[in-house]
């Protein structure tokens, strides 16, 4: 099996509409894709999600526009925080580091709420490679920023985003967001890309071609209360938590998904209990070995 076949089988296994599930008003977004041509990965933009097929990766704009193709008529904006770390390749070390990073994400979200008045996230998802994306949807951002009030005062949407974004980044860099576990906030966790009006972000459910793992949700508002998720995350050891996240990459969205494809097409055993780390680490190591041989 080659990369193109694996990725195609993965997308074909997903239920209809699942790639739009965590995108508010998808018709107002610019969509972008990567394709494999020969040995090169090429990037292209299109107007709508249903305009193309055969892609490797899928991205959408964080902004919402009247005319998405030309980025004109800003209607709203998702705030997305990208939390990355250098994760080791050895399976058990990778899983421990992944679990530790998710704990840092949860603590950082609570600290942003305490120090800067951030709302609760709408979605936290594994990026498919080195970390997590924390997503605040446009509807949440509007309430938080009192968007309608600013518009009545004649402030354009782009100005609202730029003012707030620069202010939040400055506060974080100046140390108003404290705590040893969130020191990364002053080292690039909140950066200028956060309020870039033309920013593109990997779609939840998209494959990440660097790792051949999908970007899957680990928590959403629809899935339960933030406080329960936080307590569960902080109450687990790093390895157990990393196993749960990795297991999610194999089993999401519950019908189809990467694990089903690997089992069906490559006869690879992906059926391991994440609550039994010794068993899961072995299975995960096999998965990483197989995917590593396929990477472009």
UniProtKB/Swiss-Prot annotation:
Keywords for this protein: DNA replication, DNA-directed RNA polymerase, Magnesium, Manganese, Metal-binding, Nucleotidyltransferase, Primosome, Transcription, Transferase
Top-level taxonomic group: Archaea
Cofactor(s) listed: Mg(2+); Mn(2+)
Gene Ontology CC terms: DNA-directed RNA polymerase complex; primosome complex
Active site positions, chain numbering: 82, 84, 191
GO molecular function: DNA-directed RNA polymerase activity; metal ion binding
EC number(s) per entry: 2.7.7.-
Complexes and interactors: Heterodimer of a small subunit (PriS) and a large subunit (PriL).
Record's function text: Catalytic subunit of DNA primase, an RNA polymerase that catalyzes the synthesis of short RNA molecules used as primers for DNA polymerase during DNA replication. The small subunit contains the primase catalytic core and has DNA synthesis activity on its own. Binding to the large subunit stabilizes and modulates the activity, increasing the rate of DNA synthesis while decreasing the length of the DNA fragments, and conferring RNA synthesis capability. The DNA polymerase activity may enable DNA primase to also catalyze primer extension after primer synthesis. May also play a role in DNA repair.
The protein's name in its UniProt record: DNA primase small subunit PriS
Species annotation: Methanopyrus kandleri (strain AV19 / DSM 6324 / JCM 9639 / NBRC 100938)
Gene: priS
């Amino acid at each position: 099996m080659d990369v193109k076949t694996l990725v195609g089988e993965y997308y074909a296994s997903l239920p209809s509409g699942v790639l739009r599930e965590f995108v508010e008003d998808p018709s107002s977004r610019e969509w972008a894709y990567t394709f494999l041509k020969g040995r090169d990965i090429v990037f292209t933009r299109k107007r709508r999600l249903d305009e193309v097929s055969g892609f490797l990766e899928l991205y959408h704009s964080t902004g919402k526009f009247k005319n998405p193709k030309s980025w004109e008529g800003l209607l709203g904006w998702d705030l997305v925080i990208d939390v990355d770390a250098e994760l080791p390749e050895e399976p058990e070390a990778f899983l421990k580091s992944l679990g530790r990073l998710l704990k840092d994400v949860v603590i950082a979200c609570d600290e942003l709420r305490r120090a800067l008045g951030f709302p609760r996230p709408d979605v936290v998802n594994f990026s498919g490679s080195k970390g997590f994306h924390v997503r605040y949807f446009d509807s949440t951002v509007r309430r938080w920023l009192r968007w309608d009030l600013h518009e009545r005062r004649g402030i354009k949407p782009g100005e609202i985003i730029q003012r707030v974004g620069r202010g939040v980044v400055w506060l974080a860099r100046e140390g108003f967001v404290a705590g040893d576990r969130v020191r990364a906030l002053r080292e690039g966790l909140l950066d200028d890309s956060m309020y870039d009006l033309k920013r593109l972000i990997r779609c939840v459910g998209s494959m990440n071609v660097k790792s051949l793992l999908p970007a899957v949700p680990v928590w959403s508002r629809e899935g339960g209360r933030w406080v329960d998720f936080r307590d569960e995350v902080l109450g687990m050891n790093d390895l157990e938590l990393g196993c749960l996240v990795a297991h999610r990459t194999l089993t999401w969205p519950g019908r189809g998904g990467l694990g089903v494809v690997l089992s069906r097409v490559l006869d690879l055993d992906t059926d391991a209990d994440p609550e039994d780390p010794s068993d899961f680490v072995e299975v995960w190591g096999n998965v990483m070995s197989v995917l590593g041989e396929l990477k472009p």
